[in-house]
Amino acid sequence: MKKILLVAAASAMFMAATAQTVIAPPTLDEAKEKGFDALWGDYQFGYVLPNDYTLVDDDAVKVVMNNGSTEKPGANISTSSLNTTVFDRAFNMGSSANYGKNGEVYNLADVSNGIKQPYAIFAVTPKVGGELTMYTNRGKNKYTIYVWDTTINDGEGAYVLASSTHTDSYGKELISKETVGLIADHTYWVFASETGANTLMYEMVYTPYSSENYSVKEFDATKFSTVIAPPALEVAKEKGYEALWGDYQFGYVLPNETVLADSEDINVVMNNGSTEKPGANISTSGINTTVFESAFNMGSSANYGKNGEVYNLADVSNVIKQPYAIFAVTPKVGGELTMFTNRGKNKYTIYVWDTTINDGEGAYVLASSTHTDSYGKELISKETVGLIADHTYWIFASETGANTFMYAMGYNSYASPNYGYQSDSTSAISDVIVNEMPQSDVIYNVLGQKVDENYKGLVIKNGKKYIQR
């Protein structure tokens, strides 16, 4: 059973840097106690969270809600019409940003100016590096979740996430997931696009490198509608692929233009566009893990955490040191792509560049940075980003002096039963058990507060998560 720390203070979260931190709206009871305004004049709809409200400040991360608006200050918190029974409340989000546009951000007013409602914008400052996972929904409508790093690029800032979703006819109840790596002591603004009405942010979960839940400990291919992984060594030999460094004990070289997947959901081609170092080294030894048997070697002319513009494939494959993998990914159905990566204790960035967005000019939709350092070279990081149907994305990694490992990618379209939030995936604490009551009288909500059997939503008992309905 996973060990967790439950803190019963009203605004407390999981305080140890070895745990995960849940960022969720305060409960309705707490809002009433603090005198927060009722939403639309009646607490049956929720309440308004005031600006400059510290949601969490523990050993791992500090999160403050402040939308920077004087006309629509604060954030509406909904407790009804949530499109789900998994969560019992949600931050309402929106901004002056457009769906899938990635316009530059120079100050908080750039994203809060002209907002239609009090919408949540978060300032997130990790004290320890790790990954931030968000669980969001906008019914059947399109929306983008943005994470802007205010510190990166020598203080000029850049997007590290611009994850777009449009579940459309697949169901308004689908809960999407976005995961991005954050750098210690950087400050990030998290906001959503304006879509005509509010986007729902149910919960954010921050997992530092030190958490036992950070690294991937097993890989279940059945959880994805399409898996992208290196061909087996036996297949490489059958096809006559060149042995890596002259001996198959090290792996092989995957040729350019290799189609890795062409399913009903997605097409994936490996092509680094290089004439000097064509193909991609596939390692079968020295890959820092026993969870996977092989890995794509990745690297490029891009730097760690720099987010330079990309105009063509040569921009990222020029002067690469080895045959490094670059992927062209074209979803046929919208969904989410999860990547499993590693670079030992060294720093690296996984980039996803949308070549189609911004009227064909392109933009980053992911720039997830990792530096596990002293936490262990075997840690496997995860990155999850929403992809738009019929867009083409280039996926590459920064150059770090040696190769980054991409063990596998998994894609789930909106139609997949494993899309987005899953009860057996991490939602901060432990496994979720649906409609099964715990045996003890002591029950907590996700904020560590004692509740009873009449409480609706996520509750905690003995380190496990349950849904009370």
PLM regions and their residue ranges:
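Terminal processing/anchoring signals of secreted or surface-associated proteins
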Residues: 134, 339, 426-432, 448, ...
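Short, surface-exposed beta-strand/strand-loop-strand elements in extracellular ectodomains
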Residues: 140-157, 345-361
